[in-house]
C-alpha cells in the first residue's frame, strides 16, 4: 500500500517538474522580431518575403502623431519607410546600420543615392527596394506610342482634365522639368483631373480619365482585371521611389543579414520584379533585371533606368539625428 502511494507521489512530482521545465523553457524563448510598415506601400510579394516568424506591425505615416503608431515603431526592431516620409521620422530613435556585410550588397545606384544624404542620416538607412513610377494609359494606342519616348505627350489637348497625378509637388515639378515647353509646370497642372495617391487607379478605371502616373508596385492587380490599361515607361526616364529599412538595435544584425540574403533567391527576385519592386543589390541576376529591352509591360528599359531620377530629402532641417 505504501509503495503505491510512493510511486504515485513520485509520478506527480515528476509531472510538476516537467511542467515547471516547460514553463521555464517557454519564458526563455525569444520574442518575435517585429517590423513596422505601412501596408499599402508594399506589394504582396514583398510582404510574403518577410520571414514568417516575424510580426508585421501596421503603421500609418500620415498619422504618426497618434500614439499607437509611435508605439508600434518604438516596439519594433525594424521599420520600413519610403523616401517621401523620411522627414517625418525622429532618427535619434534608430541605430546606425554599420554592418559591412549588408552594405557590400548594395549596387552603385543605391550607394550614389545614399551619398546624397547627410552622413549621420545615411548611416541609419538601408535601401531595401526601388520602385519606378509608370504611366498607365487607358484605351489610346496613339498616346502609348508618344509616351514611350518622352513626357511631352502630357500636354496634348486630348488630355486636358484627363490626367490623374500623384499628390506630390516634387514629382510633378520633376516631370515638368523634363517637358520641352515654356511654362511647363503651369501647363501640366492645367491638365489635371485630380491629384491622388490612394485611389488613382480606381479613378482611372471608373471615370473619364485617360492617364494616371503611379508607382509600378501598385499596378499589377489592375492590369490583370482591366485589359484597357497599358503600362508605359518613357525612355526619357521616370521618378524613382526608394524604400529603406531602419533598425532600433544592432543586436539583430545577424537576423537582418539572413533575411537580406534570402531576398536574392531567384524565384523571390522574379516575383518582386513582376510586382514592380526592384532590389538595389549588386548580384548579377538582380542587375539583369535593370537591363531588359522587352516590351514596356516587363518594366523600364535599360535606357529608362539610366535616365531615371531620385529625390533628396526635402527638409533636412526637420530631421532629428
What would you call each of these model-derived segments?
Residues 78-79, 97-135:
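A structural signal for short loop-to-beta-strand junctions that line the ligand-binding cleft
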Residues 83-89, 164-236:
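Ligand-binding pocket segment of bilobal, Venus flytrap-like solute-binding proteins
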Amino acid at each position: 500500500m505504501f509503495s503505491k502511494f510512493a510511486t504515485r507521489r513520485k509520478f506527480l512530482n515528476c509531472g510538476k517538474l516537467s511542467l515547471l521545465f516547460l514553463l521555464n523553457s517557454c519564458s526563455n524563448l525569444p520574442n518575435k522580431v517585429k517590423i513596422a510598415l505601412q501596408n499599402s506601400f508594399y506589394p504582396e510579394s514583398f510582404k510574403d518575403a518577410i520571414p514568417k516568424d516575424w510580426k508585421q506591425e501596421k503603421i500609418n505615416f500620415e498619422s504618426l502623431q497618434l500614439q499607437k503608431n509611435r508605439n508600434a515603431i518604438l516596439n519594433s526592431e525594424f521599420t520600413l519607410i519610403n523616401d517621401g516620409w523620411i522627414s517625418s521620422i525622429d532618427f535619434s530613435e534608430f541605430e546606425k546600420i554599420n554592418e559591412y556585410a549588408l552594405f557590400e550588397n548594395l549596387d552603385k545606384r543605391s550607394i550614389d543615392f545614399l551619398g546624397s544624404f547627410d552622413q549621420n542620416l545615411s548611416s541609419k538607412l538601408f535601401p531595401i527596394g526601388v520602385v519606378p513610377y509608370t504611366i498607365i494609359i487607358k484605351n489610346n494606342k496613339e498616346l502609348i506610342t508618344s509616351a514611350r519616348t518622352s513626357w511631352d505627350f502630357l500636354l496634348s489637348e486630348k488630355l486636358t482634365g484627363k490626367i490623374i497625378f500623384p499628390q506630390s509637388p516634387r514629382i510633378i515639378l520633376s516631370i515638368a522639368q523634363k517637358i520641352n515647353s515654356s511654362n511647363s509646370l503651369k501647363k501640366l497642372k492645367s491638365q489635371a483631373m485630380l491629384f491622388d495617391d490612394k485611389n488613382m487607379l480606381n479613378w482611372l478605371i471608373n471615370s473619364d480619365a485617360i492617364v494616371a502616373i503611379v508607382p509600378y508596385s501598385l499596378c499589377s492587380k489592375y492590369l490583370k482585371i482591366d485589359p484597357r490599361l497599358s503600362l508605359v515607361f518613357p525612355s526619357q526616364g521616370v521618378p524613382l521611389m526608394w524604400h529603406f529599412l531602419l533598425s532600433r538595435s544592432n543586436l539583430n544584425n545577424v537576423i537582418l543579414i539572413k533575411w537580406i540574403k534570402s531576398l536574392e533567391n531567384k524565384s523571390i527576385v522574379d516575383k518582386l520584379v513582376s510586382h514592380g519592386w526592384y532590389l538595389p543589390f549588386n548580384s548579377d541576376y538582380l542587375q539583369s533585371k535593370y537591363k531588359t529591352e522587352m516590351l514596356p509591360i516587363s518594366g523600364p528599359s535599360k535606357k529608362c533606368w539610366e535616365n531615371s531620377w531620385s529625390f533628396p530629402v526635402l527638409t533636412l532641417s526637420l530631421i532629428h539625428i
